[in-house]
From Swiss-Prot:
Source organism, top-level taxon: Bacteria
Species annotation: Streptococcus agalactiae serotype III (strain NEM316)
Function: Key component of the proton channel; it plays a direct role in the translocation of protons across the membrane.
Pfam families referenced in this protein's UniProt entry, alphabetically: ATP-synt_A
Protein family: Belongs to the ATPase A chain family.
CDD domains hit by this protein: ATP-synt_Fo_a_6
Designated name of the protein: ATP synthase subunit a
GO CC, any one term: plasma membrane
Length: 238
């Protein structure tokens, strides 16, 4: 397989991945357009595109309510945005392939570990901020000594593993999916005999990858809401 890389630009000594930046911006644009279009001329009795939008929002709302309880309404919009971004980003790489011998110009943003770890760190940041807001700094820090001060190292390790597992799970599934898609595309142009087989396999794999993309977005908000719920409910559980 030919090795290609994403084009980059350096600014203030930092390298920025232009492909990832462009695809992330495209993801946000697609979500904005779809939500804006689906929310126009809304009626009391939903139908058509409004019905789809409300169904997705309710799906997210019902999913996170298991972890957030009466705090659900405070985080519904955040989780809807996270779910939408991860789902669309997961599937962008399945739409087409755009590359030269040197550079790749089209990929799923979530096939890049930098994007995934950034999303995980964002969730972790929100968890800590919400924990401090609910309990105060003293009460929040005291939670790391629960149930006994001896658990401090394990509690700190748990914070790190939560971030790492959230990012690695998403990255591993989406990146591997793009690798298989790339192999099938290469198989398609290998010879006239392998082309039809690769085309058929790619259709099946694309459908399966879209399902995996949905599952990963779904799991992402389940875990994110679980982490936030643990922080905001901690004082109630004690």
């Amino acid at each position: 397989m030919e090795s290609t890389s994403n084009p980059t630009v350096s600014f203030l000594g930092i390298d920025f991945d232009l492909t990832i930046l462009a695809m992330s911006l495209l993801t946000i644009t697609i979500i904005f357009i779809l939500v804006f279009w689906a929310s126009r001329k809304m009626t009391i009795k939903p139908k058509g595109k409004q019905n789809v939008l409300e169904y997705v929002y309710e799906l997210v709302n019902n999913t996170i309510s298991q972890n957030l309880g009466h705090y659900t309404k405070n985080y519904s919009l955040l989780m809807f945005i996270l779910f939408s971004f991860v789902f669309v980003a997961n599937n962008l790489g399945l739409m087409t392939s755009l590359k030269t011998h040197e550079h790749n110009f089209w990929t799923s943003p979530t096939a890049n570990f930098g994007v995934d770890i950034t999303l995980s760190l964002l969730v972790a940041f929100i968890c800590h901020i919400e924990g401090i807001r609910k309990k105060g700094i003293g009460g929040y820090l005291k939670g790391f000594l629960s149930p006994t001060p001896a658990m401090l190292p394990m509690n700190l390790l748990e914070e790190v593993t939560n971030v790492a597992s959230l990012a690695l799970r998403l990255f591993g599934n989406i990146f591997s999916g793009e690798v298989v898609t790339g192999l099938l595309l290469q198989l398609a142009v290998l010879s006239p005999f392998t082309g039809p087989l690769a085309f058929a396999l790619n259709i099946v794999w694309t459908a399966f990858s879209m399902f995996i993309g949905f599952i990963q977005a779904y799991v992402f908000i389940i875990l994110s809401s679980s982490y936030i719920g643990h922080k905001v409910h901690g004082d109630e559980e004690e």
